[in-house]
Curated annotation (Swiss-Prot):
EC category: transferase
Organism this protein belongs to: Claviceps purpurea
Reactions the enzyme catalyzes: DNA(n) + a 2'-deoxyribonucleoside 5'-triphosphate = DNA(n+1) + diphosphate
Protein name (Swiss-Prot/TrEMBL): Probable DNA polymerase
GO molecular-function term, one example from the UniProt record: nucleotide binding
Note: This DNA polymerase requires a protein as a primer.
Taxonomic placement: Eukaryota, Fungi, Dikarya, Ascomycota, Pezizomycotina
GO CC, alphabetical: mitochondrion
Protein family: Belongs to the DNA polymerase type-B family.
């Protein structure tokens, strides 16, 4: 066999040209260059330094902020590095495509941040859009002796090699190109690395140096190889520069062939001395020299055991790519490329492609040792409350403010002076809260995000413009937000030469009910009182006289008003007393809840910002088995986005709009006991995931378990749709034909009832059983058998708040309070979701942290320059470690299946459906006893026996039960202001006026206005099913057929599942 061999040329022309320019001015270097020839002492020093270089394993495709891991041969210890030490060097992709080594050096050392004789862990990443791919499966340990170090060229060539392989593995995602390359240099301080079995580790991990590789493997021959300019793509035969014809076998007496074999195996052994690898050449071996973009590769093809193998090596015998083609014996063959498998027919047409996807488990929540030492058997007593009162009118202002903690016998309160200076009022209160005695207190405001934060920020920012404030301003680091609502506000300022801070949380995010309802729920001794809000205007702040008229009060029963009437009513005194009660009652609620949660679950209530995060922490710390019943942690953006399309909410539909008053017939309103907890005890997707893309194969849905994009066709004459679909405004359950993402179990349920399903692509998982069983059983037991009303309410809250947390969006956004200069930078470099003018030259911006190429180009900014700018921050925001869209989507699917089974049972037993809302059903069929139970999870509880009812639209209905009670619901307006006759008018297509309460936040001027307005309710607004009209009367509904409807996908996602409701 004839073999073409490659002579590796050390004298790269780019490097030679650079070295000849000793001043470095030609390539933008601002330091003198040393002579090209090294002294013996310098060479010895380089050798010593190279021996100290560490190679670091880890890192594959995924997120772009992770900890570094240092491994020994037997164990590893994680070392967390401060990202402030990281040096980011962004480079144009064209530098590597054109093998422009000179530009590579110029960019690398242009700002003198990369130091010589210093060890770094180098991680190379490709950016395509807003997604990062790590190049290769390991970091590179680098230590540059000086500008002449040949190892620089090896790093450059290694990046080109890894680019080639990356583009092969992700051809669809990257399309053989990218936007930019990021070189992350993480300084490695050997004195801070603690590795067990260090001696063996150094031997194993020590990188081979450029010089060593060059001397051991110098391929023989001096051939003029043709330079080609094509995309970096190894797996294309038409790109081969030279093909070597196969003779009678590889093993011949040709000395060049024997020397190649010897040198190749020597280098292969050198590359992995522990594994002692040796390549076994056979009679079928064929060797190619492949030139790509001026980069030389060795390609060896073999046929072994009926399998065709193609391996691609670089010039130092490092394996870059291994393809295997094998026959399946049934007229098909499979190509294996790492974790990619492609099935072909004999015509070389793709039948199906699969790709194994590795998923990590959500980690079990564990207290670290420091936290365990600090934990007490008692609940955290350092709780405080803060509240403020505001005037009404066009521009409300804060006129009273106070706080309460367990450190004081009574609340500390402040009232506005006669100059009506709200700025000084708020400043005085916050300064008092910054006293040393309150340093460990975590304060809560009920509805902070929608109310209190607006006034607090405005007045403190106004204070920053005063002489005192300019010298010592307030700061507001990294507020925690949700949908532009501030959930956590930290206020910092220097007091007596020391930095003090006050942290305020939104208690409504943890206990999503009004304070008045919370006082009732938890049997509070000092319940919330009533106050004449409409009387709170500037001119009344120092009023004394008779009690204001009842019309100044909102929603106060007359009996309660009469208790408040007196002749010597003082506005200031009444305000402070009202404020006093609010502070104490909220504090009592928080203390009760905190103690109960600590008693039941050994969890600190104060460690969580929302009720869903609290439920998640309880589950992960007390009930989760991450070894045997692991939940997949979904951080990959493509996987998340696809499965999120299958994340549908509950069904809310009107089937029949009216129940006529009839004393001879009964109707029933049923609720399912804890629907979502019940649904969660089914099997959920595990860690083993395979992506399927079906081209010609027929796939049986009953053999799959996961999420799939399908063509759907429903049966004709369908009354009850079984599969959901999003429209621009809502979620419907249509008939007809369409395509969409669905959970396999919901597809199987639909197929069993006549649907036709054709799978196009999707993700198949293994099954995991009993993941939530213990959690549901134990918490549900507390709910059904509580020691007190507090435990019952907490158990109910925790049960209903867990699953939604797993469905949180991983596309994390960041909220910052920034001055106008930073605000302008964000607007021109990032995707800004929301911006709020706070006044005083400050803005609250909610944005995607990563710099966006399209935004930069819109504003005529150089993308690479922006990335390399020291004024920009590209760290990003890491997704949470407890997000699993697969779990959330599967549980909601099981819940819809359960509800559909009940509705199908009613229809099959000649019952009539009237209305359903997520976990409730209204029907005229009395369900059998085996389906009904007051407390058993998953069974139905009879809430009402109905004598009359009107069902106008989703969440808009009125029913009358056998006790004569009228239960009214009206979406978006005050149902208390509507009468039963109003619902009857809407049924008869009459427009009805209703009262809507609106809240408008004005951060710039620092106030919130809450007002009632009159709106008209459209009686024909229901569009989730087609209205059936007979003799001008609405008599029922039928499903919408998508072959008659041009519907579009929307961003409609499940709501009210996480427990994080807004007021």
């Amino acid at each position: 066999m004839l073999i073409l061999l490659l002579q590796y040329n050390v004298s790269n022309p780019c490097l030679t040209n650079l070295l000849e320019n000793k001043t470095g001015t030609g390539v933008g270097l601002n330091f003198p260059l040393k002579p090209a020839r090294l002294t013996l002492a310098q060479q010895r020093k380089r050798s010593e330094l190279k021996k100290a270089r560490l190679a670091l394993r880890g890192m594959g495709i995924g997120d772009f902020n992770r900890e570094l891991r240092f491994y020994s041969t037997s164990a590893y210890t994680k070392t967390h590095w401060n990202n402030k030490d990281r040096i980011n060097k962004w480079m144009q992709y064209d530098i590597f495509v054109d093998r422009d080594f000179e530009s590579f050096l110029s960019h690398l050392f242009s700002d003198n941040r990369i130091l010589f004789e210093y060890t770094y862990a180098l991680l190379v990443k490709v950016r395509k859009g807003n997604k990062f791919y790590t190049i290769g499966d390991r970091q590179i340990g680098v230590l540059f002796v000086d500008i002449h170090d040949p190892f620089l060229l090896e790093v450059f060539d290694t990046i080109i090699d890894r680019l080639a392989i990356l583009f092969e593995e992700y051809p669809t995602e990257l399309e053989y190109t990218c936007d930019a390359l990021l070189l992350e240099f993480h300084p490695v301080r050997p004195e801070k690395i603690k590795i067990s079995n260090l001696k063996d580790a150094k031997e194993k991990l020590a990188p081979k140096t450029f010089a060593t590789g060059m001397s051991v493997f110098n391929l023989i021959g001096g051939f003029d190889l043709r330079k080609v300019s094509t995309p970096i793509n190894l797996n294309k035969k038409r790109y081969y520069s030279t093909q070597v014809d196969r003779l009678n076998g590889f093993i011949t007496d040709n000395p060049r062939l024997l020397e190649f074999k010897q040198k190749f195996n020597e280098q292969l052994f050198m590359a992995s001395p522990k594994k002692k690898l040796k390549y076994e050449f056979c009679d079928t071996s064929v060797v190619f020299i492949l030139v790509k973009r001026g980069r030389e590769y060795i390609v060896i093809e073999d046929v072994k055991d009926g399998e065709f193998h193609k391996r691609i090596f670089n010039k130092t015998a490092s394996l870059l790519l291994h393809l295997i083609d094998k026959s399946n014996g049934d007229g098909t063959w499979t190509r294996i490329n790492g974790n990619f498998n492609t099935l072909y027919n004999l015509e070389n047409e793709i039948i199906m492609s699969t790709k194994a996807i590795g998923l990590r488990a959500i980690p079990k929540f564990l207290y670290n040792k420091k936290n365990e030492e600090e934990m007490s058997v008692l609940a955290n007593p350092n709780l405080g409350t803060i509240d403020l009162e505001t005037t009404t009118g066009a521009q409300p202002k804060c006129y009273a403010i106070g706080f309460y903690t367990n450190l004081d016998s009574k609340p500390i309160k402040f009232y506005i002076d006669k100059n009506l200076d709200s700025c000084q009022l708020v400043h005085t209160c916050i300064q008092e809260m910054m006293r040393y005695k309150y340093r460990n207190v975590l304060f809560y405001a009920h509805n902070l995000g929608k109310f209190d934060a607006v006034f607090l920020l405005k007045e403190l920012l106004r204070f920053n413009l005063t002489t005192e404030g300019l010298n010592n301003p307030y700061e507001f680091p990294a507020p925690l937000t949700r949908n532009s609502d501030i959930l956590k506000l930290t206020i910092k300022r220097t007091v007596d030469g020391k930095t003090r801070k006050v942290t305020i949380m939104d208690s409504f995010a943890l206990l999503p009910r009004s304070l008045r309802d919370l006082c009732k729920d938890y049997n509070i001794d000092n319940p919330k009182s009533y106050f004449p809000y409409l009387f709170s205007v500037d001119s009344h702040l120092f009023y004394t006289g008779a009690t204001p008229n009842i019309n100044y009060y909102l929603d106060i029963p007359k009996a309660e008003y009469l208790k408040l009437v007196k002749d010597d009513w003082d506005f200031k005194d009444e305000t402070l007393e009202y404020l006093n009660l609010d502070l104490i009652s909220l504090h009592q609620v928080l203390v009760k809840v905190n103690k109960a949660i600590n008693f039941l679950f050994d969890i600190e209530f104060t460690s969580c910002a929302t009720v869903s995060s609290l439920a998640n922490k309880i589950f992960l710390s007390k009930f989760y088995d991450d070894k045997n019943k692991a939940i997949p942690l979904v951080k990959d953006i493509d996987l998340f986005n696809d499965i999120h399309e299958a994340y549908y909410g509950g069904r809310v539909e009107v089937f029949n709009p009216i129940i006529m008053a009839d004393s001879t017939k009964s109707y029933y309103y049923y609720d399912v006991n804890s629907l979502y907890p019940f649904a969660s005890i089914n099997d959920i997707p595990g860690l083993k995931c395979t992506f399927y893309e079906v081209v010609k194969a027929n796939v049986n849905i009953h053999e799959l378990f996961g999420f799939f994009y399908c063509k759907i066709k429903s049966p004709d004459n369908l009354y009850l749709g079984l599969l959901p679909k999003r429209t621009e405004t809502s979620l419907i359950f249509p008939g007809g034909a369409w395509e969409g993402w669905y959970f396999s179990e919901e597809l199987k349920f639909a197929v069993a009832h006549g649907y036709e399903v054709e799978i196009i692509k999707g993700y198949n998982f293994d099954r995991v059983s009993n993941v939530f069983n213990e959690f549901v059983q134990e918490v549900y037991k507390v709910k059904c058998n509580p020691n007190n009303v507090t435990e019952k309410n907490i158990a109910k809250l925790i049960l209903n708040s867990l699953i939604g947390r797993f469905g949180m969006n991983i596309n994390k956004i960041k909220t910052s309070l920034v001055p106008s200069e930073k605000h302008n930078e964000l607007l021109t470099t990032r995707v800004v979701k929301s911006t709020t003018d706070l006044g005083s030259g400050m803005f609250m911006d909610i944005y995607v942290p990563g710099i966006d190429k399209n935004i930069c180009e819109d504003f005529n900014l150089d993308y690479i320059e922006v990335l390399n700018s020291t004024n920009t921050d590209e760290k990003g925001t890491m997704p949470d470690n407890n997000v699993s869209i697969t779990t959330a989507a599967a549980v909601l699917s099981y819940a819809r299946i359960h509800m559909a089974q009940i509705m199908l049972f009613i229809l099959e037993n000649n019952g009539t459906l009237y209305y359903t809302d997520t976990d409730s059903i209204v029907t005229d069929l009395k369900l059998p006893e085996e389906m009904v139970h007051q407390t058993e999870i998953g069974k139905l509880k009879l809430e009402h026996t109905i004598t009359q009812g009107y069902f106008i639209a989703d969440k808009t209905y009125a029913i009358v039960n056998t006790e004569g009670e009228i239960i009214k619901r009206a979406k978006g307006v005050k149902s208390s202001k509507l009468t039963l006759e109003d619902y009857e008018k809407m049924y008869n297509k009459e427009v009805v006026e209703a009262t809507k309460t609106s809240s408008k936040r004005n951060y710039k001027d620092g106030f919130v206005t809450i007002s009632d307005s009159t709106v008209k309710l459209n009686p024909t607004s229901y569009t989730k099913r087609s209205r059936v009209i007979s003799k001008d009367k609405w008599i029922g509904t039928e499903i919408i057929r998508l072959d008659k409807l041009n519907s579009k996908l929307s961003t409609h996602t499940p709501k009210s599942l996480s427990g994080d409701k807004t007021k």
